[in-house]
Amino acid sequence: MKKLCLVTYTRKNECYTQAIDLIAQKLNEDFMGDFKVVICCEEMIHVPQSNYEIDIFLKKGTKYRKLISLMENDDSLYYLSIDNDISGNIPAIRQFVKKLMCQRVDIGWGRIYVDSPHGLISNLVGVDKLLSHNLIRPTLWSLGVGISVPGQIFCIKGGRFRGNLINLDTFLDDLALGLYVNVNNCKKYIVNKNLGYERPNNHFWGLWNQRKRWAIGYGSILKGVFGINNYRWKVIIHGLGYHFSWILNWAIAGLLLVKFFPICILYLIFLSFIIVGKNLKMLPYAFLYQFIFPLFHVVWMISLVRFLSKGDSNEYYS
């Protein structure tokens, strides 16, 4: 039994990254060896030599299913889940894990931002990340209807989740995990600090296809829990908050445009400031985001309708 297990996930042609190794080295120092890394993968990969324990867990399927299966076969006290493509803010992660354990909570998370965006698409993704992590997610959780956990980095108490998570086969682990946390009133530790950076989509079609995948993942969760009233409405509210709020924004802007054009522009600029906060270099992209990014929400909506119309009403929950 280890006190902390860092879990990461690799797909085909991916390797254990130096960024994850650096995080692991520091955490191993903090826990004086009461620590290990588990790499969840579908086929054997090369494991570098290290001064801490590294195990391979072979499992096919989604990241969510891999995490569930790992906990069924492992007895670590805490699991720090980090995506393989994340560059960690190591001082923040170390402090986050220590405080989480001291407070004896069930789950904790922080914020994730985009790593060095360049070009229009990646900067729009960066704005979307700011909007999600700084505004939408905190607001929904504060209202008691949040179900989204940053899937890139989170830490959970093994005994609270082992054998208890909703048995969904979805690649949106952030929603499946967050839904369980909400419905079961798990104790949370949420920090406003940035815990890491992820590489953004740099291409139009890459982002387009990502939103289609997200719609299918969301739809699979909605189908799976549709028969449970408390679950169903929270999943629906999440979809409305993340993918339909732009409609309200356009409606307000449209009303102001009819009344007085400069007021409409000032409103959009003001909202851009709210989204980016202190990250003022993103301000121009936040303004453009309000006009361009709704296209990708429409792609999400259409993909969701197509998926739901297939009529496969399989119940994935248990």
Residue ranges and their predicted role:
Residues 12-28:
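Short, well-formed alpha-helical segments that are part of the catalytic scaffolds
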